[in-house]
Amino acid sequence: MKILLVGNHTCGNRGDGAILRGIIDSLHLERTDLDIDIISRFPTSSSYLLQQNILPDELFLETKKSNSLVAKVKRRLMPKIMMAHIRGSGFFKNLAVPEYLQQFTDKLKQYDAVIQVGGSFFVDLYGPLQFEHSLCALLAKKPVYMIGHSVGPFQKERFNQIANFVFSRVNSLVLRESVSLEMMEKAGITTQKVIPGADTAFLVRTRTLDAPGHNLIHWQNQIAASKTIAITVRELAPFDKRLGVTQQEYEMAFGKVINAMIERGYQVVALSTCTGIDSYHRDDRMVAITLGDYVQQKDKYRVVMDEFNDLELGILLAGCHLTIGTRLHSAIISMNFGTPAVAINYEHKSLGVMKQLGLPEMASDVQSLMDGSIIAKVNGVLDNYEEIEQQVARAVEQERILGNKITADVLKSIG
């Protein structure tokens, strides 16, 4: 059986890396004879970080070739043309499928199925081009499985029309949390193919490395030397306007959380799930460095600058006492490796995943960061640590069972 995994942006976002590694681990757990191809927008860094061969995303490369007015018009018409050809009717069927999309569609004939790997991928702010791979797979008449997704918000009519078209035609849309389902229902998006599932980052097989790098060993020793709380931060854009919070306000508020944890006797280590490797446009390390301006005891605050992959981050987080994560997948990786985490939900996905785990109290909105109430929440976690640690372990195990069952069901339906 030959399967194509699409939708990975880059493993330079270690959350995307964990999502991809998890589905691969789960597929191989179920069947050892699978032939799996993977494509990514940034194949070089993704291959390096995942430690296996990854092919370039040809559709993404095409969008980088030209940004002329004609190219923009073509991209705007693309979904209408593709949908008309998939339907086999409509005015836009008179227009040819763009050559690069037809070429990609033809290449899909060698695969038994296409799996669109999860994450927060189908978001109105990201635009309709996110549906290109799925539209090509539907045109090629290949089974399409979307596994481990958060979808929405749905506040743009054009985006919603394409979402309805695609989501009604895929074999299954496996959601990793229920808040997305509520958003779909509220916006009138079809839910007939929805299956409740899990974030595939929970399916990463936790393991140690046979030959850990010296930089990993260094940070393991640093973390082991003093009781440690890990944090992850990010540039809030493009969500800052929806949140009504500026980047500086966010950083100042997070600085107060760090100071409170240091006063409680912890060192705080900033890890990053997104770095600028291979020209990736986000580098959380820069935000973490700026945060240092608001830390009072600077010798108790450290910023990790190394390029660790998601597995190495998990190994480091396993040595920490708690994770406070703006990046959802820092919280997921942390919990998967045995360390409780508080997730700051700047998007609905963090709250949704924590609800899915049965741990809604471990999600905290950005407002709680701004008004400082998150500090009391974190202190409450630390005061009841053993009980919460056990709750997290049970919840993660249930997610693994659910996620691996869905993988098994998908493979059975493919044949």
From Swiss-Prot:
One of the record's GO molecular function terms = transferase activity
Q: A single Pfam family, by name? A: PS_pyruv_trans
State the similarity comment.
Answer: Belongs to the polysaccharide pyruvyl transferase family.
Which InterPro entries did the record assign?
A: Polysacch_pyruvyl_Trfase
Functionally, this protein is described as follows: Involved in the biosynthesis of amylovoran which functions as a virulence factor.
Q: Name one GO biological process term.
A: polysaccharide biosynthetic process
**Family matches, as PANTHER family:** COLANIC ACID BIOSYNTHESIS PROTEIN WCAK (PTHR36836:SF1)
Record keywords: Transferase included?
yes
Keywords of the record, alphabetical order, are:
Exopolysaccharide synthesis, Transferase, Virulence
EC class, as a word, reads: transferase
Q: Please identify the protein, giving its name as recorded.
A: Amylovoran biosynthesis protein AmsJ
The source's domain of life comes to Bacteria
Which residue spans traverse the membrane?
none
EC number assigned by the record: 2.-.-.-
Q: In which pathway does it act?
A: Glycan metabolism; exopolysaccharide biosynthesis
Q: Does the keyword Iron apply?
A: no
